């Protein structure tokens, strides 16, 4: 299984998102689907244009912004591979949030 870490922003976002009806689905995507190797076929993952390594995962009305851990980060954590979840945002806020990644 891959390691999935949450940034402080993602932890704050997730706390808010878990209070919504989509909360259980978001939690499943982060804890189970992203950690699975290989990812489930129904996991909707797309690269974010113009952002380099950042990816977007669709989870109901929410979008999860993440990137793969680089080799140094994996080595420091003692894992072969993993991901850093940076934000968990409502889809209507995604474009505003993405300005920081470009």
Predicted stretch roles:
Residues 1-31:
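Arg/Lys-rich, positively charged N-terminal/basic patches that mediate binding to nucleic acids
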Residues 15-16, 46-47, 56-58, 75-78:
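Short histidine-centered beta-strand/loop micro-motifs
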Residues 1, 52-54, 80-82:
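A generic structural signal for beta-strand entry/edge sites
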Residues 31-58:
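A short, surface-exposed loop/turn module that caps and links secondary-structure elements
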Residues 58-63, 67-102:
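Enriched for short, Lys/Arg-rich terminal
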């Amino acid at each position: 299984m891959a390691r999935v870490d949450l940034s402080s922003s993602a932890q704050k976002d997730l706390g808010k998102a878990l209070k919504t009806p989509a909360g259980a689905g978001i939690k499943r995507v982060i804890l189970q689907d992203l950690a699975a190797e290989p990812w489930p076929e129904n996991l909707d993952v797309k690269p974010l244009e113009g952002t380099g390594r950042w990816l977007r995962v669709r989870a109901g009305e929410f979008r999860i912004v993440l990137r793969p851990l680089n080799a140094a980060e994996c080595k420091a954590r003692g894992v072969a591979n993993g991901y850093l979840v940076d934000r968990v945002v409502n889809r209507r806020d995604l474009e505003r949030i993405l300005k920081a990644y470009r």
